[in-house]
From Swiss-Prot:
It is a single-pass membrane protein. Changing residue 175 to R: In strain: CH9802. Its main location: secreted. This is Hemolysin E, chromosomal. The chain crosses the membrane at residues 183-203. Disulfide bonds join 87-285. Changing residue 268 to A: Strongly reduces cytotoxic activity.
């Protein structure tokens, strides 16, 4: 009977640690890396590079899009920081949990139970906070997607050959070309006519087609960005769904942990299983914190 109780305790405790570790591992390997933020940083810089290539109306939309993308990134990293904080607490608690196996008694068993419940409680709290931050991040992506649709329509109008914006760009090219032709004249009125003819050929045959190609490349850039933002929004939604499942699993195992008797006679194999589960989660925490810039990692107790 005692052995059955011990087996049950080991199963519950091991499952509790592994469930928390699994949620963290999911965040570490999937949720936290789902968006290629380096690409987005480069894209945000590109938004500024194109600022001379669209109308005032389009410029306002581009400014809104840039703000929304930066807001989304801020909230995403806020979620990352929340999980980082959980790791900081969990590593210390789990190290204390492992050390309590030395000269094991009922008081230490009770302390271990409190520790595990604390780890699970903090996990639920921090992952829920991360979930909320991801929701806001997703909403910003969604809003940016809507703005990009409006921008596409605006650019289509701007870049139409009949639009006032396109004509203003053509007029600017012609003015600069003809001014340059006039400045270069040395052969009297006939020279001016010839220079203007050459300028007209350059404008119509080269500069205006180049303008069309440049404007087309700008529109293609924003079309690609629109597709990227839509995919990012889908990825975050999928991440939130996975996280919801993990939070629910931690909640269930926490309830079971609270009702489990911890002070039982463990054999060496049982002790090894529990210690290894705790050490594995400490290592997962270390891996997560290292990837986010922590230089000095928590040492796993050798007991």
């Amino acid at each position: 009977m005692t052995e059955i109780v011990a087996d049950k305790t080991v199963e519950v405790v091991k499952n509790a640690i592994e469930t928390a570790d699994g949620a963290l591992d999911l965040y570490n390997k999937y949720l936290d890396q789902v968006i290629p933020w380096q690409t987005f940083d480069e894209t945000i810089k590109e938004l500024s590079r194109f600022k001379q290539e669209y109308s005032q109306a389009a410029s306002v939309l581009v400014g809104d899009i840039k703000t929304l993308l930066m807001d989304s990134q801020d909230k995403y990293f806020e979620a990352t920081q929340t999980v980082y904080e959980w790791c900081g607490v969990a590593t210390q608690l789990l190290a204390a949990y492992i050390l309590l196996f030395d000269e094991y008694n009922e008081k230490k068993a009770s302390a271990q139970k409190d520790i595990l419940i604390k780890v699970l409680d903090d996990g639920i709290t921090k992952l829920n906070e991360a979930q909320k931050s991801l929701l806001v991040s997703s909403q910003s992506f969604n809003n940016a997607s809507g703005k990009l649709l409006a921008l596409d329509s605006q650019l289509t109008n701007d870049f139409s050959e009949k639009s006032s914006y396109f004509q203003s760009q053509v007029d600017k090219i012609r003015k600069e070309a003809y001014a340059g032709a006039a400045a270069g004249v040395v052969a009297g009125p006939f020279g001016l006519i010839i220079s203007y003819s050459i300028a007209a050929g350059v404008v119509e045959g080269k500069l205006i087609p180049e303008l069309k190609n440049k404007l087309k490349s700008v529109q293609n850039f924003f079309t690609t960005l629109s597709n990227t933002v839509k995919q990012a929004n889908k990825d975050i939604d999928a991440a939130k769904l996975k996280l919801t499942t993990e939070i629910a699993a931690i909640g269930e195992i926490k309830t079971e942990t609270e009702t489990t008797r911890f002070y039982v006679d463990y054999d060496d194999l049982m002790l090894s299983l529990l210690k290894e589960a705790a050490k594995k989660m400490i290592n997962t925490c270390n891996e997560y914190q290292k990837r986010h810039g922590k230089k000095t990692l928590f040492e796993v107790p050798e007991v």
